[in-house]
Amino acid sequence: MGKGSEGRSAAREMTAEANGDKRKTILIEGVLYDATNFKHPGGSIINFLTEGEAGVDATQAYREFHQRSGKADKYLKSLPKLDASKVESRFSAKEQARRDAMTRDYAAFREELVAEGYFDPSIPHMIYRVVEIVALFALSFWLMSKASPTSLVLGVVMNGIAQGRCGWVMHEMGHGSFTGVIWLDDRMCEFFYGVGCGMSGHYWKNQHSKHHAAPNRLEHDVDLNTLPLVAFNERVVRKVKPGSLLALWLRVQAYLFAPVSCLLIGLGWTLYLHPRYMLRTKRHMEFVWIFARYIGWFSLMGALGYSPGTSVGMYLCSFGLGCIYIFLQFAVSHTHLPVTNPEDQLHWLEYAADHTVNISTKSWLVTWWMSNLNFQIEHHLFPTAPQFRFKEISPRVEALFKRHNLPYYDLPYTSAVSTTFANLYSVGHSVGADTKKQD
């Protein structure tokens, strides 16, 4: 582990195939593999690390994404090996030495954490997370069963929070850091996201892995592909026509993001993107969980005496609140930070340091509210580590960053939220700015 060096890339070679396609190579722990004909079980994310012709060093990404997999190394060993002497650095000797030092330090630190048990799941923590969600849903429906308008409103709000908490625990399961058993975490992810949020856990995992592979990297991080509903960076709106309906929408996106855009994004996911993916990939069990969600909701609302129309309205309100809860918390960790060019290759540590921020890590309330993902830097460094352990390792991560002159941001929650909305406003008003400068 850690034998590879971030930044090294494979020399470009032509395949022996008659069609003349470029060979796709990938470098892991100093070994160069031919991945041209390899169908990655985890989807197209592997293309980020082969980049068509020149494979980049994927050691850190490979180990973090496959830490709990018993099959990954078997797949890797089955790939044809190429002459590693053709591997050359795209950086100067000084820059490559800096990156190699980070790689060695990071690998040694990670091995320490594994040996000390920081990657081990906790059964009491698992029980707490599940019981909390069940209790929140039960309380929400109990409140909605009361005749008081105040109880009804509180019940809808509580239900939205419960759906958001389902999103948090699904996120943990999707990373394989809940039970630590990949197949079990995957099935639980599908159940909690399907019943709790009405969405596909498998689709989410497919997309979210791309975000982790290259956060805030244009044409790689799917979290930047948010048009037409919202835009988080000026570079993604350069092709928006000034004066168009989209341009007008973006000018007010800072005001619409929470009350309108979050709901529209959620509805787009649950009614179109996720079902389309589930149909294409034949994720039949996920349809079962989502149908169970709808049947359960409307049956229960009917039993409580609510009309179909009122039941739909209450569903949309609670669903929308859940979307606001989740989407806003994810937005504050990345969206206001700089982006990198498609061709840029950052070190694994640099992605976490420069394109991620921690938020109020000393606050127990924020830690609960964000379900330990206010330690976003640690999460991006170690995506398969149980998230409740990040608080314990954060001082050591900060020390690691200090040794390599990397920033370690920890913003107050209120500052992170205000910065996020200020960025939405700035990006929305940047449409056409390049044209005006040219004039």
Swiss-Prot record:
GO terms for molecular function: acyl-lipid (8-3)-desaturase activity; metal ion binding; oxidoreductase activity, acting on paired donors, with oxidation of a pair of donors resulting in the reduction of molecular oxygen to two molecules of water. A motif (Histidine box-3) lies at residues 376-380. Disulfide bonds: none annotated. Its cofactor is Fe(2+). The chain crosses the membrane at residues 123-143, 254-274, 287-307, 312-332. This is Acyl-lipid (8-3)-desaturase. Heme binds at H40, H66. CDD domains: Delta6-FADS-like. Pfam families: Cyt-b5, FA_desaturase. A motif (Histidine box-1) lies at residues 171-175. It comes from Thraustochytrium sp. Fatty acid desaturase that introduces a cis double bond at the 5-position in 20-carbon polyunsaturated fatty acids incorporated in a glycerolipid that contain a Delta(8) double bond. A motif (Histidine box-2) lies at residues 208-213. Belongs to the fatty acid desaturase type 1 family. It is found in: Membrane. Residues 7-88 form the Cytochrome b5 heme-binding domain. It catalyses: an (8Z,11Z,14Z)-icosatrienoyl-containing glycerolipid + 2 Fe(II)-[cytochrome b5] + O2 + 2 H(+) = (5Z,8Z,11Z,14Z)-eicosatetraenoyl-containing glycerolipid + 2 Fe(III)-[cytochrome b5] + 2 H2O; an (8Z,11Z,14Z,17Z)-eicosatetraenoyl-containing glycerolipid + 2 Fe(II)-[cytochrome b5] + O2 + 2 H(+) = a (5Z,8Z,11Z,14Z,17Z)-eicosapentaenoyl-containing glycerolipid + 2 Fe(III)-[cytochrome b5] + 2 H2O. The cytochrome b5 heme-binding domain acts as the direct electron donor to the active site of the desaturase, and does not require an external cytochrome. Its EC number is 1.14.19.30.
